[in-house]
Amino acid sequence: MIVQRTAAPTGSVPPDRHAARPFIPRMIRTFAVPIILGWLVTIAVLNVTVPQLETVGQIQAVSMSPDAAPSMISMKHIGKVFEEGDSDSAAMIVLEGQRPLGDAAHAFYDQMIGRLQADTTHVQSLQDFWGDPLTATGAQSSDGKAAYVQVKLAGNQGESLANESVEAVKTIVERLAPPPGVKVYVTGSAALVADQQQAGDRSLQVIEAVTFTVIIVMLLLVYRSIITSAIMLTMVVLGLLATRGGVAFLGFHRIIGLSTFATNLLVVLAIAAATDYAIFLIGRYQEARGLGQDRESAYYTMFGGTAHVVLGSGLTIAGATFCLSFTRLPYFQTLGVPLAIGMVIVVAAALTLGPAIIAVTSRFGKLLEPKRMARVRGWRKVGAAIVRWPGPILVGAVALALVGLLTLPGYRTNYNDRNYLPADLPANEGYAAAERHFSQARMNPEVLMVESDHDMRNSADFLVINKIAKAIFAVEGISRVQAITRPDGKPIEHTSIPFLISMQGTSQKLTEKYNQDLTARMLEQVNDIQSNIDQMERMHSLTQQMADVTHEMVIQMTGMVVDVEELRNHIADFDDFFRPIRSYFYWEKHCYDIPVCWSLRSVFDTLDGIDVMTEDINNLLPLMQRLDTLMPQLTAMMPEMIQTMKSMKAQMLSMHSTQEGLQDQMAAMQEDSAAMGEAFDASRNDDSFYLPPEVFDNPDFQRGLEQFLSPDGHAVRFIISHEGDPMSQAGIARIAKIKTAAKEAIKGTPLEGSAIYLGGTAAMFKDLSDGNTYDLMIAGISALCLIFIIMLITTRSVVAAAVIVGTVVLSLGASFGLSVLIWQHILGIELHWLVLAMAVIILLAVGADYNLLLVARLKEEIHAGINTGIIRAMGGSGSVVTAAGLVFAFTMMSFAVSELTVMAQVGTTIGMGLLFDTLIVRSFMTPSIAALLGKWFWWPQVVRQRPIPQPWPSPASARTFALV
């Protein structure tokens, strides 16, 4: 309770206007108008000579890709090896039809591909799977109504060149007229990032409007004065314009880089901080005026009581945000310098422009006079309760903190940026169209490359390549693996060993009828042989008869020779007797004319032939005897010949049976082999995969090689699709398994020792997850150390600095837990992975401000004793700090209107943290700890628990004062 007590009526003593004043506030007050004009000129120059912050952010946007991450290194190396470009920016163009895509859609697609390939400035390469028959089925949906092509763009994701490339691709697509019923979407990671930046820039103006609306309402509620609120808004607007202009100037001249997150956070943080500092300054000025000080004294009291707090607060925020520069992820790294520079500008404006405006406006009547007394009594009652029951109040504050802390174990994060962007963004619409026909992972694949020291375009290495693909496909959660051995995600048809064997029997199948005809002709030969056998048997019978006849003829001829010789002898006797008569016939000249003569002469000539005949018969007899000898031998040979013919017949029949059975068996085997090959093909079983060497000369296959093997054949890549969302925790967890599977698959093979590179969506977010953990640790520890040092310098107390930092950490955990409770468990939206790091750094910095102001005020009042100092500090700073905290909290919560859900989550998390810090930590927890620790709170400083007794002031120096 405050009691106004007045000393004896000896007259008040006017303040000494010639007393020594601090140099800096005196110079600011003296040159207030030039300072204001200087700031106005600077602000005008900065905002006129360079474009606005949003425009500069678009022009000088930096890449959000972590270049040092293994996945980024892998993707760039893959692009270099395959000669497809050196950027990490890729877009997907999706064609969706109401009916299966036909020739018209394909013609449009070919025309679009030609236009894209012609734009070498923005398009580095294409993966034209749909245009190649070998891989077409892999790029078209199962219902035939959608197809896609991947385009590698110039510039890394997030850079102005990448965003320009996305716009160039969109322009090319928009200028082409698709067939009726076909829609074309430009989507993919690069398009999503570009749309995110545009959405963030659109949201920034809305956020600024909502923020100023919130600030105006809060200021009017707190100060109940339009003029005071207008003056404070002027200070805030000028500070914001200076910050925007300064950062835009540095960004425009490429001194610093900017991102969507940096510009959004910078604007809101600058507004909130500038508002806080304006509240600190004007609040302390009005408090001094309320205690009876004149305007000049109140000005110096204001500056002396808040300048070090504003400086410490600003340096804390600037230093903590600058610690983000030590991180490795560009998402955080790009925030560090812009936010730190922006906060330095805000602090500079608050410590120069703010006091100058107060110095000028305080000279004009009652512009800054308090319209009502500050609510000191209520806050002093809170301070008195804390001093009286510090333990229970501290326990109650900790219990409230446990509400959020107990929620933290259930915290889950999400890496899918699509879930945090409006569904009507063009890139999101493209993703939605793709997901109507493809799995979610098809648009976000992984790419694994194995790089060896030799050319892999041979059958042996292709066996290993297929082994790698099978090993990756066997990893749990992998739904599809595309490689040269499975271009469309399934094994190439007719590449199993059983099928190749069945194909080798194709020629046998073609000659089967011919062989069967030849076998059938063997029966004809058997019939011919049988006919020969029959004839031979008849010949044998005839030969036997001939032998018998010949033998009889020899016997008869032997007798005939004797008879003929006897006949010759008798004729010789006759001739000897009639020789004289015979001679007459030869002497007669006219014997020819005398018939009797010529007849008798002819008889005698005939008798002369008996000798010749006898001689011939004698010569014939040995021959007949020889024939008589041979004929039995010939007859004896005939049965053997007949038996041989019969044996030939039997062999021919046996051969026929064998050939016929063999042919039937081969036909059956061919049918089994063909059935086995067809079964292996139908089952997509590539356990016995093999590509014969002649396949590598096939022109179609060579086109497929270009897609999956590097130009020199030393590297092969695999396109991997997950089951479900690759950006989920489960998808991220598969990355290590994929690498392990590939590494194990090449053990003991010709590819052992080859380098393995893995990039893609889940791989990148795994690196982001790992980097986020590392960056959070680095930024958090460095920010805590920096904040502790600043608090130590400001309070000159190790314990007080430790308490401030400790309570801020506790507040951070509680507020983040509350954010998890609201967003994850109530709204059903998991917190984006960026939220934790951004909220932690800003809450660490901003949360320490209000504790710092409280402890600084407590330090001013400590001469009255610890307990009394706590009560006075609570009464003097309670309303100001609460107003500042509420304004800052609701200002950050204005992010809730952003199109970027991640910024809404960051803003609400920081806002809830500031509310908890303002209403619980600063109001109850920190003063309770100070009351419990007593003089140890100020160690190593020495303070008294109670004030040193002093004599009652003399009447001559009596003044109106306040007693507790």
Curated annotation (Swiss-Prot):
Subcellular locations according to the entry: Cell inner membrane
Keywords: Cell inner membrane, Cell membrane, Membrane, Transmembrane, Transmembrane helix, Transport
Induction field: Repressed by MmpR5. Repressed by iron. Regulation is IdeR-independent.
InterPro entries documented for this protein: MMPL_dom, MmpL_fam, Mycobact_MmpL
Keyword Cell inner membrane: yes
Pfam families given in the database record: MMPL (PF03176)
SUBUNIT field: Interacts with MmpS5. Can also interact with MmpS4.
Family statement drawn from the similarity comment of this UniProt entry: Belongs to the resistance-nodulation-cell division (RND) (TC 2.A.6) family. MmpL subfamily.
Protein name, as recorded: Siderophore exporter MmpL5
Organism: Mycobacterium tuberculosis (strain ATCC 25618 / H37Rv)
